[in-house]
């Protein structure tokens, strides 16, 4: 059987507030309108996960502006949540938007990998869906990918599909990721995420075509280096025959399977048991993984390597 991986995960959201206003977003709240997660509540939630097979704690944060007086407190909360997760025996992965060099270097201490969606490299989208989203500037996000490479951090990135990009722009975005990977070799997976309409978005953008998604997967597999794993979120491909077509085109990972998809809250995951059975009936073996791929275990600091070895042994 062909192995398909997934990450048994749970999401902590330090805050939903975000200074970006992407017109397709179903996650954000207005700055200062959201009550931040406290460390004590986070610890209680994580302690309640004992015995449920959860490995990855995805720390997924809305963005506080880099010049805000609250940026330091925001970052310290994100860092401390990673430390709490570590101390409770979990494996943190953080996605908190573009970070400074010092911020990303500190998060490396308490995370097994970091992530940031490239989304699309087209600056044209800054006049449409990203017109009120300063941190979606493509060069800023590409620079973040390079910075993670310079610092030797295993990294997840990806494309958001169906937000107004052209076929050529998709190809250019994949080429940009490939170029960064050829220089640094730190990108472990690329998510190909089809836009899926939700109740909170302000733009009338329709769902991305499953047939188009398969075409993009085929293109990505041709462009990206072989060591990069292609990932799709299975809850955003609800028709199982479409999911099988994605696997046939080159997808080998289904990402974090979580109780609630915080970015797409209208789309729920099947149970792992259901998904595993369906895949097995079609020749695929669903297997859990860590938020860092085995190739990159040696990139981690000694403390993180030790925590992995305890679990593996």
UniProtKB/Swiss-Prot annotation:
Matches recorded under SMART domains: Elp3
Cofactor(s) the record lists: [4Fe-4S] cluster
First-tier enzyme category under EC: lyase
Molecular function (Gene Ontology), one example: 4 iron, 4 sulfur cluster binding
Catalytic activity: 5-amino-5-(4-hydroxybenzyl)-6-(D-ribitylimino)-5,6-dihydrouracil + S-adenosyl-L-methionine = 7,8-didemethyl-8-hydroxy-5-deazariboflavin + 5'-deoxyadenosine + L-methionine + NH4(+) + H(+)
Cofactor details (free text): Binds 1 [4Fe-4S] cluster. The cluster is coordinated with 3 cysteines and an exchangeable S-adenosyl-L-methionine.
InterPro entries reported for this sequence: Aldolase_TIM (IPR013785), CofG_family (IPR019939), Elp3/MiaA/NifB-like_rSAM (IPR006638), F420 (IPR034405), rSAM (IPR007197)
Pathway the protein takes part in: Cofactor biosynthesis; coenzyme F0 biosynthesis
Annotated keywords: 4Fe-4S, Iron, Iron-sulfur, Lyase, Metal-binding, S-adenosyl-L-methionine
Annotated ranges, domain Radical SAM core: 4-235
Domain of life: Bacteria
PROSITE patterns: RADICAL_SAM
Complexes and interactors: Consists of two subunits, CofG and CofH.
Primary role: Catalyzes the radical-mediated synthesis of 7,8-didemethyl-8-hydroxy-5-deazariboflavin from 5-amino-5-(4-hydroxybenzyl)-6-(D-ribitylimino)-5,6-dihydrouracil.
Record-stated family: Belongs to the radical SAM superfamily. CofG family.
Name of the molecule in the record: 7,8-didemethyl-8-hydroxy-5-deazariboflavin synthase
The species this protein was found in: Synechocystis sp. (strain ATCC 27184 / PCC 6803 / Kazusa)
Gene (name only): cofG
């Amino acid at each position: 059987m062909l192995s398909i991986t997934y990450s048994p995960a749970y999401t902590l959201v330090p805050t939903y507030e975000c200074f970006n206003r992407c017109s397709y977003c179903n996650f954000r709240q207005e700055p200062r309108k959201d009550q931040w997660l406290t460390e004590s509540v986070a610890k209680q939630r994580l302690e309640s996960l004992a015995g449920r097979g959860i490995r990855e704690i995805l720390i997924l944060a809305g963005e506080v502006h880099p010049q805000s007086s609250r940026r330091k407190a925001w970052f310290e909360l994100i860092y401390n949540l990673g430390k709490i997760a570590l101390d409770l025996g979990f494996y943190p992965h953080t996605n908190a938007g573009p970070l400074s060099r010092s911020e990303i270097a500190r998060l490396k201490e308490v995370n097994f990998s970091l992530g940031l969606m490239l989304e699309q490299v087209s600056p044209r989208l800054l006049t449409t869906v990203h017109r009120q989203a300063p941190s979606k500037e493509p060069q800023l996000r590409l620079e973040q990918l390079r910075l993670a490479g310079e610092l030797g951090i295993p990294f997840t990135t990806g494309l958001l599909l169906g937000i107004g990009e052209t076929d050529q722009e998709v190809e250019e975005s994949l080429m940009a990721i490939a170029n960064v990977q050829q220089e640094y070799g730190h990108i472990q997976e690329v998510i190909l995420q089809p836009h899926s309409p939700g109740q909170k978005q302000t733009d009338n953008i329709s769902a991305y075509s499953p047939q188009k998604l398969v075409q993009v997967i085929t293109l990505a597999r041709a462009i990206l280096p072989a060591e990069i794993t292609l990932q799709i979120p299975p809850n955003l491909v609800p028709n199982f025959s479409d999911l099988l077509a994605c696997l046939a085109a080159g997808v080998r990972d289904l990402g974090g399977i979580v109780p609630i998809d915080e970015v797409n809250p209208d789309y729920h995951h099947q149970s792992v048991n259901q998904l595993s059975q369906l895949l097995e009936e079609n020749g695929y073996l669903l297997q859990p993984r860590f938020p860092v791929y085995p190739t990159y275990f040696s990139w981690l600091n000694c403390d993180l390597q030790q925590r992995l070895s305890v679990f593996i042994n």
